[in-house]
From Swiss-Prot:
Keyword Endoplasmic reticulum: no
Signal peptide: none
GO biological process: protein modification process; SOS response; translation
Residues that bind Mn(2+) 1: D248, E260
One cellular-component annotation, GO: cytoplasm
Protein name: Probable alpha-L-glutamate ligase
Every ATP-grasp domain range: 104-287
Bilayer-spanning residue ranges: none
Molecular function per GO: ATP binding; metal ion binding; ribosomal S6-glutamic acid ligase activity
Amino acid sequence: MKIAVLSRNPRLYSTRRLVEAGRERGHEMVVIDTLRAYMNIASHKPQIHYRGQPLEGFDAVIPRIGASVTFYGCAVLRQFEMMGVFPLNESVAIARSRDKLRSLQLLSRKGIGLPVTGFAHSPDDVPDLIEMVGGAPLVIKLLEGTQGIGVVLCETEKAAESVLEAFMGLKHNIMVQEYIKEAGGADIRCFVVGDKVIASMKRQAAPGEFRSNLHRGGSASLIKITPEERMTAIRAARVMGLNVAGVDILRSNHGPLVMEVNSSPGLEGIESTTGKDIAGIIIQYLEKNGGPHLARTKGKG
């Protein structure tokens, strides 16, 4: 197969591993800088150009689109879909998963366990919003934040009011969530490919920190997940329409709660923790399910 990898940086661990795994299995792997791809939108035959040449003959595309380039990245991916190239994850599903609030609304509608979450626009509604999620301590999140940036734990209601008013004053969209104390600063990253959790790891926040992101100094270890956690991760990925996803789950007193569904999960932490060839499993998924003109949405939506 001829497989495109949409990535800003060919030296990133995840990009490198996907290229290695594809080549090991005899595929032609081409890394394309997402922001250097350009297209004629109105042409009769959908096309993408890259460094002066048309991109042709691809069977599948692996999007590794960073949060900051979601809009342009999804436009490029949509064009690939319109050309009949099979996407590992579809543009619609990626755009959906990048909108944190919409993701939670979709997951909630399907009855998937979530922390109590509030959303408001006006500072006048802050006291009621805090009460809605059960009071302090609580977590405030910027909707545009990634890798734990823009996530604040407020120990008191006074602190929560100050932080909320500051964010709202800066015209940021924020959501407020109950703090799951019993999770003890740990979460579980379940790596879903197709309809299977192929690997999972526990991420523990550094001492004095509550955010378990590895980018924030958290540590990772092996963990055995329960059947309920496995099913929750698979269902969450399915609701979002993602073939490959990193589903972050908290263990609470009332079962697994989904924190986030990531459409472009990193491979370094999960591969080094579990010793599994995740990149190889992703390529095998493409071999089994990919191929020209198998894109479900064909770039619509």
